[in-house]
Design a protein with these regions (language model features):
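Preference for long, amphipathic alpha-helical scaffolds in soluble/luminal domains
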Residues: 2-346
């Protein structure tokens, strides 16, 4: 039997960073990092997002062809469990990983593992990246979706990130896992008459973060290459998940300049960044991409800094956005994201 949790419960259990909602979680992750964390990006407590933020940071540097410090990659590789998976953070890497526990949100999870696989692969560590993919394949549910923790119910975010990881690390995969997982994502789409978009889990309302990360899962691998000319914002088509979700995200960004938070607290920069990546990957959303990038560059400081400290996951995501949209990562809204990220490393 699988364990199903609501999106709000998942976030409420301190998994904001694993979902990519670093704009919401940064303020509560402010304790000093452990002294042994040589190579870790950022000074915030790594308990809930160490692997995820490190992975986004490395992926962002790779996307912009920046030098990736060996110590940063070593830190991430050392976090890997014996079976190829990753927990959010292991304070003692000499101790075995605990089992994945969806009831208590502990042990290895798919979000950390997927992002770590992507980062390690882009950094040239192909063997551990492929080990991570093997673990992801083994925890895919019978419905073809992916759970946050093994044994849990499938959800849009976890499925989207896992599919991106498989497409990045093993683009030659012929097992059917990717199209079947994408079909599962398509089953979460809402009617075009209501605006489209994806629910976090079947039966729920449209969810901005779930839609943006799962949209990337429908769109391909990381990093996303820029395109010469984007088509206009896509129309919602009831039988086409890609156009449905793309239309939902493009409409949201065009209307408000950003995907709005699912918790009613204004712009969600993380959802907006993921949405921009997905739109560019599909070659659509000219107006939305322009508007989204304008918001991200304008508000870059409030997104990438918390109490004066860099938020590595935010910087990494914006580096990928910069690479996909031909923005200068050395002056993204006036901030040198590469220098800031490297300078935050322990």
């Amino acid at each position: 039997m699988t364990t199903q949790v609501s999106f709000a419960t998942r976030v409420g259990r301190s998994v904001l960073a694993a979902l990519g909602a670093v704009s919401l979680s940064a303020a509560v992750l402010t304790a000093p990092a452990h002294a042994a964390d040589t190579g870790l990006f950022g000074t915030q407590d790594a308990t809930y997002d160490g692997v995820y933020r490190q992975s986004l940071a490395i992926a962002g540097l790779a996307a912009t062809d920046a030098r990736i410090p060996a110590a940063a990659v070593d830190w991430l590789a050392d976090q890997q469990c014996a079976d190829g998976s990753f927990e959010a953070f292991r304070s003692n890497t000499s101790s075995p990983c605990s089992p994945s526990d969806p009831e208590n949100f502990s042990g290895p999870d798919t979000n950390s593992t997927a992002m770590a696989a992507i980062a390690l692969y882009l950094a040239g560590r192909t063997a551990p990246a492929r080990d991570a993919i093997v673990w992801l394949n083994n925890v895919q549910n019978d419905d073809w979706g992916f759970p946050f923790y093994a044994g849990g119910a499938s959800d849009a975010n976890s499925t989207g990130l896992s599919v991106v990881a498989i497409q990045t690390v093993q683009p030659q995969d012929k097992s059917g896992r990717v199209p079947n997982a994408q079909a599962w994502i398509g089953g979460l789409k809402l009617k075009c008459l209501s605006g489209g978009g994806l629910a976090y889990q079947k039966g729920g309302p449209a969810n901005g973060l779930a839609s943006s990360q799962a949209y990337m899962g429908l769109s391909g691998a990381l990093p996303v290459d820029p395109v010469d000319t984007l088509s206009p914002n896509p129309d919602c088509k009831k039988r086409n998940a890609v156009s449905n979700v793309g239309s939902f995200l493009a409409s949201a960004i065009t209307k408000d300049g950003a995907v709005q938070s699912d918790f009613g607290s204004g712009a969600d920069y993380s959802s907006t960044g993921w949405a921009v990546l997905g739109l560019v990957a599909n070659g659509v959303g000219k107006g939305a991409v322009k508007s989204g990038v304008s918001t991200l560059t304008r508000d870059v400081e409030s997104y990438t800094y918390s109490d004066g400290d860099l938020v590595p996951a935010a910087a990494g995501l914006l580096l990928m956005v910069a690479a996909a949209t031909d923005e200068d990562p050395r002056s993204f809204g006036g901030i040198n994201l590469k220098r800031a990220l490297i300078g935050s490393m322990q």
